[in-house]
Amino acid sequence: MLSTVQNPRFLLRQCRHFPPKRRRFHSSTPLFLSQPQTLASTDPPSSPPQSQILTIRDNLINRRTTAVELAQLSLNRLRLTEPQINSFISVSETVLREAEEIDAKIARNEELGPLAGVFVGVKDNICTADMPSTGGSRILENYRPPFDATAVKRVKDCGGIVVGKTNLDEFGMGSTTEGSAFQVTANPWDVSRVPGGSSGGSAAAVSARQCVVSLGSDTGGSVRQPASFCGVVGLKPTYGRVSRFGLMAYASSLDVIGCFGSSVADTGILLHAIAGYDGLDSTSSKHEVPNYTSQFMSISSLESKPLKGLRVGLIRETLDDGVDKAVVSSIVGAASHLEELGCTVTEVSLPSFSLGLPAYYILASSESSSNLSRYDGVRYGSQVGADRLNSLYGDSRAKGFGPEVKMRILTGTYALSAGYYDAYYKRAQQVRTLVQKSFKAALNENDILISPAAPSPAYSIGEKKNDPLAMYAGDIMTVNVNLAGLPALVLPCGFVEGGPAGLPVGLQMIGAAFDEEKLLKVGHIFEQMLKGYKFIPPLLADGIAC
């Protein structure tokens, strides 16, 4: 028996349009197991959540430590945790040399970049010069790009140290990181569970403190769902906010490079470093890039209702029967805390919500069938020896691509074929327009929208690997945001039962186009409601420095 959220009739049914509903959100305390210091609380901490980036910078400038010492500490933590997590496909060999260069700058009293000495993980579908960039696929196993992606170049220009390339589902096609051709990444909160996907390696690396921040990509939720599963902050920017140059194309009208951090401040600092117009990407926007963290303040220094007047819409369809009840309780609790901060929280309906998931998979698969045609063993990709050209193409792709990639290429080719284009691809584009209109209407009445980031907490490795429908259904909370091209921030809001210390739940905040600044400001205030705000996984409880 399929659960409601797995049932195709649930995914395809037309949602009724509900009028806005205003009610008080009383938290029915979810199962916040162990580590009570992480519970959402009405008693704010005395200081805001610590920014690791700002702490590193302050320690370097005031010479309390050196970049080399920090690098050695981080590499040691990575060596201790990596055998259990498998976050990285490859680790840079130049880390210590880059750290030495930062120390030399300090010795010469030169100005440091905003990311100086900060360890940054990079998802392995984002190109890095002179480092492997595999896309998680055998067909690119030996590929070393001659250039950096624009986002990577900007990280390096700001002094960031790329520690390595993180694991992912092949070409970003998956929700568990089990689809990698090289290894399966585990969730630091429970190593028997998935970290989410497709940016599972990037999320797990930040959660396990193997790096300070990381870059991922988000086509249908690949930053936000892993952030929820791993208890970290994840940001999907507006489409066009961050250059896609150097990102391996999956679905070009949906792909976005996003950010992970252990705090909203670190995530905002990373976004500021990589955002902005790039002439190498024709979809890049010329919208001004604000200083996302310049207005961040401790909640103790603000008025008692720091978010007074903010209109928040809780998306009703995201609390449906197919969503884990403990997850719903956590989100309702988060809505209650937003009200305590001064927000007006109202239930809103997105009439086209349930149509987004099937439309997304038609559009994404169609675009991938075109984008991945370049990997033929001649222009790109590993080549398999063959006597005839057609055999070379076929054998190279058959042996180079994994099963999920093949399935999506076939699905996309079918949807674009003569006789089926109007029935599938064209209708999916029409649904996309409906989704965009639904969000526009909702955001005309609300400043931000909120929902769960995923319908469940992290599940066991292998649990859904052979059930594509169930795995696809897990994206229902996130794909609509990509169809609309809007920004969304995910941050931890509590725990539910599972694993040795509970499993994190993520709250998704959705904003208007290019309004990342508002999302980050609200997120920064909200996270200070979490006592001590240290979502430290059990993996790090055994004496490994955090």
From Swiss-Prot:
Its EC number is 6.3.5.7. GO terms for cellular component: chloroplast stroma; glutamyl-tRNA(Gln) amidotransferase complex; mitochondrion. The keyword tRNA processing does not apply. The active site is at residues 123, 198, 222. It is found in: Mitochondrion; Plastid, Chloroplast stroma. It catalyses: L-glutamyl-tRNA(Gln) + L-glutamine + ATP + H2O = L-glutaminyl-tRNA(Gln) + L-glutamate + ADP + phosphate + H(+). Residues 21-52 are annotated as: Disordered. Its main location: mitochondrion. Residues 27-43 have a biased composition (Polar residues). Keywords: ATP-binding, Chloroplast, Ligase, Mitochondrion, Nucleotide-binding, Plastid, Protein biosynthesis. One of its GO terms (biological process) is glutaminyl-tRNAGln biosynthesis via transamidation. It holds the Pfam family Amidase. It comes from the Eukaryota. GO terms for molecular function: ATP binding; glutaminyl-tRNA synthase (glutamine-hydrolyzing) activity; hydrolase activity, acting on carbon-nitrogen (but not peptide) bonds, in linear amides. Belongs to the amidase family. GatA subfamily. This protein may be expected to contain an N-terminal transit peptide but none has been predicted. Subunit of the heterotrimeric GatCAB amidotransferase (AdT) complex, composed of A, B and C subunits. Allows the formation of correctly charged Gln-tRNA(Gln) through the transamidation of misacylated Glu-tRNA(Gln) in chloroplasts and mitochondria. The reaction takes place in the presence of glutamine and ATP through an activated gamma-phospho-Glu-tRNA(Gln). This is Glutamyl-tRNA(Gln) amidotransferase subunit A, chloroplastic/mitochondrial.
